[in-house]
């Protein structure tokens, strides 16, 4: 059985203020894959991730999540399909691992962001799946 493609890019170029910093990025992620993005400080790792997460506008090309172009996907729908936790935004001494995992449920909560028992069960299930 062919694995479902979750995310791919097509001719993606990223940068700031219309200036291309990294060109023709090719990414293809399938269900169940674990991928790392490795490089020295300033190489553009965060710029690539922020562009994929729709926090930065792509300079050229497209990003697709489940074969839907991100430019056509509302932010709330994207948040249900993808989350990225940047380490500089976390204050780990004030958060448990469960707190960080629970951040992925917030797009499914109401305006107050309060987790329901169902949300808490999903968090527990996710933690069990990755054995933490």
Where are these regions (language model features)?
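Conserved ABC ATPase "signature" region
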Residues: 117-132
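Short coil-to-beta microelement around the adenine-binding A-loop and adjacent beta1/P-loop entry
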Residues: 19-20, 76
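Conserved catalytic motifs of ABC-family nucleotide-binding domains
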Residues: 72, 88-102, 107-114
């Amino acid at each position: 059985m062919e694995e479902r493609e979750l995310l791919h890019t097509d001719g993606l170029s990223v940068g700031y203020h219309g200036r291309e910093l990294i060109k023709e990025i090719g990414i293809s992620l399938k269900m169940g894959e674990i991928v790392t993005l490795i490089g020295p400080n300033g190489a553009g790792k965060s710029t690539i991730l922020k562009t994929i997460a729709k926090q930065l506008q792509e300079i050229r090309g497209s990003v697709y999540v489940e074969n839907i172009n991100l430019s056509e996907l509302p932010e709330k729908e994207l948040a249900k399909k993808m989350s990225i936790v940047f380490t500089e935004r976390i204050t780990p001494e004030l958060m448990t691992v469960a707190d960080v995992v629970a951040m992925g449920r917030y797009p499914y909560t109401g305006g107050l962001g309060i987790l329901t028992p169902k949300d808490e069960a999903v968090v527990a299930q996710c933690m069990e799946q990755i054995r933490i």
